[in-house]
Amino acid sequence: MTDILVLDLETTVERIAGRIDNSPYNPHNKIVSAHFGWLGWDDVDDYQYAVYHHIEQSQSDSTKSLREALRTAKILVCHNAKFDVSWLLEAGFDVPEKIYCTLIGEYLLAKAQRKELSLKGSAERRGLRNQKKSDLIDHWFQDGVDFFEMPLATMLEYAEADVRTTAELYLAQMDDFDAQENKSLITARDQMNEMLVFLVELERNGCAIDLAALDTVEKEFRAEKVELTARLTEIVEQVMGDTPINLNSGDDMTKVVYSREVIDKAIHKQTWNIGTNDAGKSLMPPRMSSNQFSDAVRATTRVVEKTQAVCCSHCNGFGSIQKFKVKTKIKLGKKYRIQTEEPYKNRTKCKNCGGLGAIYQPTGETAGLRMIPTGPSYAAAGGFKTDKETIQTLIGVATRKRKPVAVEFLTKLSRLSAVSVYLDSFVAGLKRGTRKNGILHANFNQCIAATGRLSSSNPNAQNWPKRGFPVRRAIVSRFDDGLLLEADYSGLEFRTCVELSRDAQGLADILEGKDIHRQTASICLQKDPKDVTKDERQGHKWASFQPLFGGTGAGMEPHIKAYFGKFYEIYRGIEAWHNSLMTGTLKNGIVQTPSGRQYFWPNVVRTRGNRVSHSTQILNYPVQGFSADMVQLACIRALRFFRQASLRSKLILTVHDSIVVDTHPNEVEQVKSILVEAMTRIDEEMVTRFGYKCVVPFDVEISAGKNWLDQEELSLTNAT
């Protein structure tokens, strides 16, 4: 028997607005049972369980055995350990200093390949002797019965299988990490398990939400949505005539934006390779010359004309017809059907106008904005793409071609889409997730993004716009006169790319303090760098990032495209590193970061035009992954320093490259100093952790305010 404890908890499950909520921060949820045992040579020894809250058991089992096991254990092993550790801490248990999550192990060993990482999926994929017994409980959950109410014997059998499967999975992972080709992953694994403890701290602390401020933001967004919809409707009437258009329909937006409609959807999908393959991946667009593309567009779609509505004579504009019941009578042995004056309850849809109440007659004038798709990648099931990225590209095209109506429509359509997301996801998410005590406990995910970056849900703060986003005003301090303090890495992805490539000019620019994002915005906006605003700098970061990942500026305005070419001339070391990455990946399919994280592309090939398949991922993943590991190391250090200082201030969020702290008014300077120390001096700890010495310095910007929106920059003088 070892000092490694394998554990699985079963809990009750509440529902909030129809959504499953098994959070330990829901006051109505409880631990139903704990199942645990000591790791043996090939299984669990001394398996035990304790039932604390079940309908069949009137008296709760003692917590003594679990407390003693947790006190004795050196390592706690769970699958999705963040869930179990959070529950244990909220229930008043102490946990071992070292946590091992088998979900993290499977995630890292997958090396960015899509694999089922659940306990059941992992056990089945590996062919483990022990298997998760989901079939025992699935039908109970489908019927709305959770662990509290389902038969106790069923739950106990299911949970024991979970513990034994987790133990066997752990042992299999230890063998995998021992293999020479996987040894580098051990460093990344250990850091991710430490980061798990930091995320538990964040989630437990939660964010204070000002619901009154959130209501105000919601009203502002709803008013803006009404205004945008009204103006877009006016433009639609201007360019489409009387044709009815749904702004949320991809088919209708193809008509408005591209002035075309699909003739036959089946033929359209076949022509443009729209759909997924057997592996669930999107099919690649067909290769076509420009002439072939133009011919295919004409073959699969037709030009849309403006229409004029004429009242339907069959239904008089109602769109439906009132029919009357018919009775059968017999006279002289013959049956007669006689219409009565009794109407049917529901009116019948008019076949002549399709229920529209009008006939839409073409006027002969081309409708829509007449934007032109430029290649097969524009094709979509409903015609041609009108997604966020495509709309932004089309706005640039319309601007260059001086189409003011198209620019206005596309800009407002993009904004309407954003506002709808803000309302449906962010505002509604905050309202739904905020507990009665005014605290929101977000959920952070380590094993979703292939790169190693964190994602979050309830809410997805990683997708919030960084500056000027009104929803941020609702996130406030829980302390009287407290501040929300945010420390953000300055230009982290550029610095990471320079670090990995060891580009000499990039290093010189960083050491001189050149603001790369400001330089980029000045070129894109064709204005002096000193005249670039903060929002403009933020809004043009994409142009700084794209060359880092092999972007060429194709399809963009000439002066922006020229910037991309100039970038590679200036930073030749980055271009050389890109070439070496792709050459190396063609040889062995692997890219590895200094932190030990690996990415694997088993099917990488050189394509026509001397390009490399998966090139964007090959160039993107190591920058994102190493950046993620640096941020995570900073988070681990911040938690360590907070605990050493016994601060009242709370670590509450990490978003992108920043750490956010709910700061007690008496601890502002102390928190500022700790964050600077934790974030700017990660290079010292990277030497001991990764055996890697950085040449690039990492700087932070710190701001503070009463809420997360209204922030003022703080001076870093004497911050360390």
Regions found by a protein language model. Give the residues of each.
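Conserved "right-hand" nucleotidyltransferase catalytic core of DNA-directed polymerases
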Residues: 1-10, 15, 33, 45, ...
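Conserved catalytic palm subdomain of right-hand nucleotidyl-transferase polymerases, strongest
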Residues: 6-7, 78-79, 100-103, 478-492, ...
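Short acidic, Gly/Ser-rich segments with clustered Asp/Glu that frequently serve as metal-coordination loops
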Residues: 9-17, 489-496
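Active-site-proximal helix-loop-helix substrate-binding element of RNase H-like nuclease domains
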Residues: 29, 40-178, 276, 518-525, ...
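Short active-site loop/helix that positions an aromatic residue
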Residues: 82-93, 105-110, 253-262, 490-505, ...
